[in-house]
């Protein structure tokens, strides 16, 4: 079996692109992979386009060998969009391997480990606060709107929600420290924001009651000092987790040791060597 073609698809998801890759073979089997970045689809597409000549004619079923070859070809740009491009292609190769054997990808790796997976409402309110016109949902302009959203979460059967630092109002947004959010771009948590976050999570808690778990995603918005203060004020709500994106494992350990709020991280790390310092220090 040989790879005969590789195609990429940048899909309009309303306010962000999704990225897919399709790998075709000379035997008719097709594999699909997903490698979205959210902001740089053309960068991922470019990496795949650059790798394509070295992959055509190779056997996709030998996905470990293909991954090593791709890693060698991108070793000067190992992370970021290059890593995401490799991940999408790797998924497509594994998809082909599973189809070749007539089994699911899960079976290829030893079978499922659970019969069901708990679902939470992710980024609850975040999309509505910026894109209610696209979604066709009510805007979030007041704390009453946050209350209504919390009740909607419960009425739709979710047992948990995750939100961001929502800033309701006429020109509502979310953020708080950087990455295009309201406020400064220096990752400092201003004095007014801490009680604001307390009100936000308290409003959700009052709306959903004690049976629904709450999560807050801070993204990369705040430095250690701000995360310390936010984690402390959230202790009263017994959060399922506070999600902090951070490339400093020692700073994250400092936050973890300072609070009873559970900390979640890691979605922006690549490969074992980036995860290892977190495992070693936590």
Question: Which residues make up each language-model segment?
Answer:
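N-terminal amphipathic alpha-helix/helix-capping segment at the start of soluble metabolic enzymes
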Residues: 1-14, 103-117
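Short acidic/histidine-rich active-site segments
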Residues: 35, 218, 266-268
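Metal-dependent enolase-superfamily TIM-barrel catalytic cores that perform enediolate-based chemistry
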Residues: 116, 121-255
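Metal- or metallocofactor-binding catalytic centers and their adjacent structured scaffolds
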Residues: 26-103
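Structured beta-strand/loop patches that form or line metal/cofactor-binding pockets in enzymes
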Residues: 1-32, 36
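Conserved, mostly hydrophobic/aromatic
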Residues: 3, 28, 51, 89, ...
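Catalytic alpha/beta core domains of metabolic enzymes, predominantly
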Residues: 249-282
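Ligand-binding pocket scaffold of soluble enzyme catalytic domains
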Residues: 21, 26-27, 32, 100-103, ...
